[in-house]
Structure formats: C-alpha cells, structure tokens
Amino acid sequence: MEILNGPSGWIEVICGGMYSGKSEELIRRVRRAQIAKQKVQVFKHSLDIRYDKDYVASHTGLKIEAIPVSSSADIERLVEDDTQVVAIEEGQFFDMGIVKVCQRLADKGKRVIVAGLDQDFRGEPFGPMPYLMAVAEYVDKLHAICMKCGNVASRTQRIIDGKPAYYDDPIILVGAFETYEARCRNCHIVLRRDENEK
C-alpha cells in the first residue's frame, strides 16, 4: 500500500465475509501504528458483544482495546484532536452518517481505518459499507474458505436451527460460529418463505 505524504488524511476499508480476517487485519494495522508511536483511537459498535464489549476481538483470539459507541456522532465527538489514526470495527452496524464522519476525519488529516461486512446474510450490500468503499482511498476485500466445499468464500451464511435463514429474517443478528458460516457463491443459500411452502 502506498502511503500518502503530507497532512492529508485518508480512508481505508477492510471488508469481506465472516471469518475472512477483517478484525485480525484491523488489529494488525492498529498495532503497526502504535509501534510507530502514532496516537490511535479504536471504536467498535456497541451491538458487537460477542467476545468482549470493550475490545475488538478476532475469532482467533487476537484483541485490542476499543471504545464502544452506538452512533457515528459518538465517534466524531470522542475523537481527540491529536489522534492520528482512527480505527472503526463493525462498520456495517453504523448509521449512514458514518460516511460523512469518516470523510470529515480524513479531511482533518487523520488516517481512518474501517472494517466491516460488505454483504449481509442475503448476499446484498450491508448498511453504509458500500458507500464507505466508494469514498475510500484504499479498499481491501478479504476472503474466507467455504465451509461446505473449500472454495473461496465471499459470503456469510446464516444458519438457524441447522438450516439456512429466510430472506425476510432480521438483517442484524449478532453471532459467531453457532450462527454463521463462510460460503462461496455456489454454496450460499437464502430461503424464501413462499418457495418453502410449496
């Protein structure tokens, strides 16, 4: 990745399906900035309580301290003037205001790193993530391995009682291995109630 010189900030987006390593990559970038003695603030959406409410945690056990917030306005209010790097976990859970907040922070010369799911369990664009990807200087799409066939997985399969979820189920359901699997395009299934009732 080429780093821009000067006071200009920028936005980096780390996206992909579940189990693709997004949180690990966010943690890696934050730790590199900390080693370089840059002031970093890490935020995560308060909906994410899977492992620890005060940490960004990967499925593999890596973790880093974070400030839980419930809106993009909270991030903008809490970012300190001398912060150089702002890291945001679970970008898909935030309101659409997160796009403008990230742009304003980058305009102030800050490096903004956002990690999140680019698609919901239906395989459709998730919340503000596609808009963040559009305005970011750098976008990295990570992939997992399909838990059915071993191919490259770009989607997240929601499993309820051992079966794929229905299209009209709620978009947000926080969970991990007990609720979601990494799937490729061919193995990803979303049931529709009318099809199932025939």
UniProtKB/Swiss-Prot annotation:
Any one GO MF term held by the record is:
thymidine kinase activity
Keyword annotations: ATP-binding, Cytoplasm, DNA synthesis, Kinase, Metal-binding, Nucleotide-binding, Transferase, Zinc
- What's the name of the protein? Thymidine kinase
For this UniProt entry, what is the primary localization, expressed as one broad class?
Answer: cytoplasm
Classify the source by domain of life.
Answer: Bacteria
Q: Where in the cell is it found?
A: Cytoplasm
Q: Which Pfam families match?
A: TK
Q: Where does ATP bind?
A: 16-23, 89-92
Give the source species. Dictyoglomus thermophilum (strain ATCC 35947 / DSM 3960 / H-6-12)
- EC number(s) reported in the record: 2.7.1.21
Q: Which gene encodes it?
A: tdk
An example of a Gene Ontology cellular component annotation for this protein is:
cytosol
Binding site residues for Zn(2+)? 146, 149, 184, 187
Q: Which HAMAP family match?
A: Thymidine_kinase
